[in-house]
Amino acid sequence: AYEIKECDWSSDVCSSDLACVLHTHTRAGVAVSAQKEGLLPISQQASLLLDSLAYHDYEGLAVYDDERGRLRADLGDHKYMILRNHGLLTVGRSIPDAFLSMYFLEMSCQIQISAQAGGNLNPVPQKVLDGVSAAVKVQESKGSAAELTWPALLRRLDRLNPGYDS
């Protein structure tokens, strides 16, 4: 069973319209967070989120309250964040929203690490990135894709792992 822990400082980091913060230390996420260039525009997945991606420099163990303000300032209005040399963070207006954001950020990091192993990267041209950014804004104005995707993910989980929630 997994325990959902309430982050005691999430309200200091997030604006009042956000309901969920997710933070991970996955191998691919930490690997990209350790790269000076950060997330590269080399995949469709990355191109979907680059305009809403923020960075926060590593300050050591997050035990000091004064980092909260800097983290909030760096996050701004973004919903994706790479914590340099540390991991990934996403925020959302709901759990499904933050989860789907983390899914795409993590997938983007996995793709980048795999592509770098092959070498000779082919970045998405800026003109294409601009078009993707405009399309994402139009889609987001129509509502949250996460609210449609979440029930499907739960149905899949029910099929693959019945009883996970008991």
Model-predicted segments: where are they?
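Single conserved hydrophobic/aromatic residue that forms the stacking wall/gate
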Residues: 1-13
